């Protein structure tokens, strides 16, 4: 048979195709062996060679030995050529078999298998159960059964919602206020109640009814002890830590009345409403006095006593005051002249005519109870500006001409053309400025007093009046 015969060429082509098929199979098997070898070598490098493989024939050998034996145990072709990755041409169709088992990826990474005990990232299941996701709440409130993680949280909760009493400090005055039967702080104004002491204190510092009360004479009907008080009062611990003040002295009888639940009468809604109305009236009466530039502070730094003492002195010296209002003032007309407006008659001077209102000493035995009993109770602040019955004007409704123990309104100038009879609020609640017109018998805004006299009564504004008006504004702004 010649080389160029058709049978020889077909035989050569068939052998060549069979060799190519066998070589493709060998290349595929070699690639699989190389990938397995690289995987084992990489796992050994990552684990530092510490993982051991169990030899099925017995004994332990390292992964490097396994890889070497796996590489050396590759079958050879019929022509004696080893099946290594380096041999480029291998002509054999013998299948490739690995003699040693290869560890799975889960076993190399240390994951849990079916035969090994349960582990989680190197931690046993028993240890993992000792570490819960959320901490246990061990502090329980005995009032509302709420749970708290820390002791500080429970303490803040009790101080905010279950504290028996709170202390409101306003200037030199110190009020000890207790919760009512519903567990809330009720103000004397009767408008709202609060559960949190800080909210109640914010309201109390701006409430005229609360500010008009004497810290040492708080009515027991308003601030009485609830029947189920098992917490230690807050005032006992705080009074030991602070410096005593003269205004903090409480009579023993009053303190016992507030601390002993058996001595407190039952709750009476009508009595509580009457006391609340009396407190509102006290706030209305206290705003009627004029606060002079310099008031002797020889009392207990209480605006209540200072206002009432000033009213008593003004009534005692009624006959010496050059501008004191006569009892029959509403029945007589007053001549409007410019004589009283001389510069020497300026009350804002150091030696003015009204300096006699300030004595060297004021009586200190003035109680707010007298003014509450003698003064009419006004339901609202605006009702004091209305006309009073029996032919009296609005000044009488404001308290001028009442008994000497009441807080009165001291007139600055009796017969001014603008009839400016103003008041400065002692408690500085709203910077309220009020002017009184004698012709209209009504109260108007102080800023509109001059325009009111010019437009409604057609009176000319003299220079003296402008001077007095400007001085009064300076006095109000000081």
Curated annotation (Swiss-Prot):
Keyword DNA-binding applies: yes
PROSITE patterns in the record: ZINC_FINGER_C2H2_1, ZINC_FINGER_C2H2_2
Listed Low complexity bias regions: 62-71
Molecular function (Gene Ontology), one example: RNA polymerase II cis-regulatory region sequence-specific DNA binding
Biased composition (Basic and acidic residues): 226-238
Polar residues composition-biased segments: 7-33, 43-55, 115-135, 260-270
GO process annotations (BP): regulation of transcription by RNA polymerase II
Transmembrane segments: none
Keywords: Activator, DNA-binding, Metal-binding, Nucleus, Transcription, Transcription regulation, Zinc, Zinc-finger
GO cellular component: chromatin; nucleus
Recorded superkingdom: Eukaryota
InterPro entries on file: Znf_C2H2_type
Zinc finger (C2H2-type): 139-162
Compartment(s): Nucleus
Ranges where the record places region Disordered: 1-71, 104-135, 218-270, 311-336
Function: Acts as a DNA damage-response activator of rhp51. Binds to part of the DNA damage-responsive element (DRE), (5'-NG[GT]T[GA]-3').
Name assigned to this protein: Transcriptional activator protein rdp1
GN (gene name): rdp1
